[in-house]
Amino acid sequence: MLQQPSPPLLTNSRLHIGFMPDSEGLNRQILESYLQLREQDFLRRSHFFGGRYENLYFDRERIPAIARVLEQAESYAQNLLQQANNLRSGFWINDMGSGESTTEHDHDEDDEMLSAVYYVQAPQDSGNLVIVDSHSRTLLTPQAGMFVFFAPSVVHSVSVNRSGERRISVGMNFGPMSKQ
């Protein structure tokens, strides 16, 4: 009997998870600064779905403690991409209230090489990160202090926040440093 080759396995090994050291106090500082922002502090907003803007952009100086998160994320990104000091990054806040969700999307819009999310506040039942591919869905329960890195082409969403509290995360994209 001739043995036919097996079809390729479908895997979902596209996620890389890390944790921010000493995140509890840091997240408290980020949250306190974020809650003091006013309308005029936001540079822009994007992705208006379900009555809210999913992405809120601001100068990093408005939340000084966020610098540590961005530095740690860049270190992880340099390691994952094997690109020392050749990366630029962009970031935004996603503030998801009770009953809200984030629509299915990807980050493959420009020259991004890696995307990430960092969880500042992720109460129990505040919505799972849903990673979608053509054959499966992977649910990841967020934790405050957790980073999740993935390719920009990975389609993902966030399920409904049923916690009664806000879920606050920082989205990030990493790309090549522009040549000038």
Where are these regions (language model features)?
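Residues at secondary-structure transition points
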Residues: L56-Y57, A122, M177
